[in-house]
A protein has these predicted regions:
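C-terminal motif of bacterial Sec signal peptides marking the signal peptidase cleavage site
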Residues: 4-7
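N-terminal export/targeting and maturation segments
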Residues: 9-71, 75-80
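Extracytoplasmic electrostatic interaction patches
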Residues: 63-148
Length: 148
C-alpha cells in the first residue's frame, strides 16, 4: 500500500472542562467526545512523565490525532487534544511524506511527534534507531514521540 499525506489540521491545545478521578474515566470521556471507540486507539504511550493516546478517527478521514491525559495537583485526570490532526489516504503517488509535529502538554512540556510510512526515512527524521519506532499494522504507519 502506498500512502500520501492528505492534510493536517492544527488543533489548539484544548483543556477539557471535565475532570475525572480515574484515568480510565478520562479516556472514556475523550473517546465519547471524539465519537470513537477503544478500537480506534493506536497506542497509549508514556514519555517524559506524560501519558499520550494516539488514535485514529474514522469519522474524519481516519485522521491521526494525539491526546494527553493530564493529572493535576489534586490527582484529577483530563483528556486534552494536543498537536495536529493528520489524515493519510492511499495513492499511487510515490512521493511518500512523513510528518513531524511539535506538541505541548497542559503542563507546558514539549514533544515532537513523528509519523510516516517509511521506517528508514522516519528514523532519520527523528534521529532514532529503526528499532525504536512503533508500528501501526492497520494503517501501515510508523510513529514515535520524543521529548524536546
Amino acid at each position: 500500500m502506498i500512502i500520501t499525506l492528505v492534510g493536517c489540521q492544527t488543533n489548539k491545545t484544548s483543556q477539557a472542562n471535565n475532570t475525572f478521578l480515574k484515568y480510565k474515566s478520562a479516556v472514556e470521556y475523550g473517546l465519547q467526545d471524539e465519537g470513537i471507540t477503544k478500537d480506534d486507539i493506536i497506542d497509549e504511550i508514556q514519555v517524559g512523565g506524560e501519558q499520550f493516546i494516539i488514535f485514529a478517527n474514522p469519522n474524519l478521514s481516519d485522521s491521526i490525532a494525539i491526546a494527553n491525559i493530564n493529572v493535576d495537583k489534586n490527582g484529577a485526570y483530563t483528556w486534552n487534544l494536543v498537536g495536529s490532526r493528520c489524515a493519510f489516504a492511499m495513492s499511487s503517488n510515490h512521493s511518500i511524506p512523513s510528518v513531524k509535529d511539535e506538541i505541548q502538554t497542559i503542563s507546558r512540556k514539549k514533544f515532537n511527534f513523528y509519523l510516516g510510512p517509511d521506517k528508514t526515512k522516519l528514523a532519520l527524521m527523528a534521529d532514532v534507531d529503526n528499532e525504536e519506532l512503533k508500528y501501526d499494522e492497520k494503517r501501515e504507519l510508523y510513529y514515535i514521540i520524543r521529548e524536546i
